[in-house]
Amino acid sequence: MTLWLNHTIDERIAMLQRAEEKFRINQVAIEKDWWVTVVLNALFKCSCADQLIFKGGTSLSKGWNLIERFSEDIDLSVSHEFFGIEKTTKNQREKLRKKARRYFLDTVSAELDENLKKLGVEGYHIENVVEEIDEDGKASPVASDKDPSVILVHYESMLGHTIEYIPPRVKIEISCLSMNEPTEDRLISSYIEQTFPGEDAAATATVRTVVPTRTFLEKAFLLCEEFQKQTPRHVRMSRHLYDLERLMDTGFGKQALQDIDLYERIVKHRSIYYAVGYVDYSKLMPSEIDFVPRQELMKDWEGDYAEMCNHFIYDQTLSFEKLLERIKELQDRFRKAF
């Protein structure tokens, strides 16, 4: 099968240009999407493939075609059952995180490299993220039980220009703490393959993907938890508002607010596996949930939304004011659910 990278430079540039015209998204993003796709393909050939799950915002665009947003990161999980740890005590959760982190950084990282080479991919290097940089620029080792683990695939862009908001690297976040269900197998392909069928078939893969009903609820819960912090984040966070708005009128969004069992299972799972001191998990329940940014946060969130609209969305967008109106409407729907 053919891989985009195997074409001549002139052919690859022509394909990027045509895909840019079709999807109305910058060539830098088209190129990065190809790397996201081929990295996904290689990851789902690793030894944990049977327990590997594709989730998050990128799964909404690449797996389900539900959002018109370029998604640059790969969010994955491996079932805790894969590591043979079933109990949920604090000590067992710490043991699980340590065992999983060693496996991700030692085994998955090496297998990813091997699988990319088998596909014929060149011009990249893999970095296991083992240090954190604080606000003062000081580096410190990442904790041995840190979850998720982060692996970066740095690639050599064939384009002469770059965009600060879209660096030439694929960020892989892989966790051992996520739920296993509900999921469904989905076909993943690059923008190049969708523009020129058959010309990038080797990068295409079928991957186990989280069903959007769950992703929809998890995004609302993530925001509700974030806004319980004294100083909530805003950089690259407005995408969750965009995704919620895009999903709220779909069958998945409507079903999510009718499935009390799924709703409560996700809340319970988060309270056990993601427990953090600043979150009151009872506030995730419909009667109390709040995922609308506070007034003092609006300027920062509006700025982040503008950045996202400029670089990542390839369809018409709502104004920030209209987006907030829709999110408030959605919050009302949550409050009236069940």
PLM region descriptions:
Residues 54-58:
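Glycine-rich beta-strand-to-loop/alpha-helix junction loops that act as flexible
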Residues 1-52, 64, 68, 80-338:
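Structured mid-to-C-terminal alpha-helical surface segments
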Residues 61:
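Betabetaalpha-Me/HNH-type nuclease active-site subdomain
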Residues 76-77:
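Glycine-rich active-site/cofactor-binding loop and its immediate structural neighborhood
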